[in-house]
Amino acid sequence: MAAEDTPEWEDDAQPAARSSDSSGPHLWLVPTPVGNLGDITYRAVEVLRDADAVACEDTRRTGALLQRLGLRRPLVRLDAHTMYRAPQVLEQYPRLAYVSDAGTPGISDPGAELLREALSRDIPAEVLPGATAFVPALVLSGLPTARFTFEGFLPRSGRERRERLGTIAARPEPTALYESPHRLHATLLDLAEACTPARPASVSRELSKRYEETRRGTLAELAEYFAQGVRGEIVVVVGGRTEAEAEDTAPDWDSVTAELAVQGLSTRDLRSALMQRGLSKNDAYALALKHRADR
């Protein structure tokens, strides 16, 4: 590495010390390990140690983590059901650290709502770098990673789930998503139907733990492999749509739109129907307007 390319790191203790020396209100979003306690950072420990209190989704889980780290701080439950208490908690504990059950807060958890509340009150906020599950899973998938989309958790059922599956199927870049063990098999089957059974994908579970596993294959192969169930936290990565796949499966959208338009659908319903079939939002809207105008 050339001298001019050398990273300009600050001293390990400086970022935490800079914030901790301030006496004013402050919110820290602190990543916690997704499985291996050794993944906690020095800075995360310092912030947890110096905060007035630690807000979290599960006080028992976070209490066990703090005990392992040798820390004793007041714990406040702030999850999806108790986030209405955020204004009160921010006032009671001006220097507040927030952790999720695992990984980086603010992604697929209530931390984002707490952050918005703090920002609305002009409270300075920091997000510490640290552990997350979908980035290691994305890299381990072996799929191209220059561009990707993170979906979080899919809707469990209904039109919104179908629309999201159609959007995933149409993307040229890989998609990473979280799934629970008891829904994994059904989701893999739905993805195989939406994306074609031959679409490459991977399933990673128990990342950073003793029984970590990443299984790669087609969606059909993965659905068969995990048909008997699985345990652990799961990340699914689905490969992007290839040009050849797009050419083989691309429908005649004008014909599809014309068939739907004769049913008397409104422009909004027509657009929604096209999106359910995998067309992008902008293209669906343009076709819906065109066919409504032709009638």
Predicted regions: what they are:
Residues V76-Y84, L154-G158:
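Conserved helicase motor
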Residues A2-A17, G24, R95, P174, ...:
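A contiguous loop/helix-start segment that scaffolds small-molecule binding in enzyme catalytic cores
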Residues C56, V127-G130, L177, V203:
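General beta-strand structural signal in soluble alpha/beta enzymes
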Residues A16, R85-Q92, T167, F226-A227:
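Short amphipathic alpha-helix with an adjacent loop that forms part of the alpha/beta core around
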Residues H26-V30, Q92-S100, F148, E173-L177, ...:
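Generic beta-sheet signal
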Residues A2-H81:
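Glycine-rich, flexible N-terminal cofactor/catalytic loop recognition
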Residues L48-V54, D122-E126, P174-T175:
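Short active-site oxyanion
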Residues E113-R171:
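Class I SAM-dependent methyltransferase SAM-binding "motif I" and its flanking Rossmann-like core
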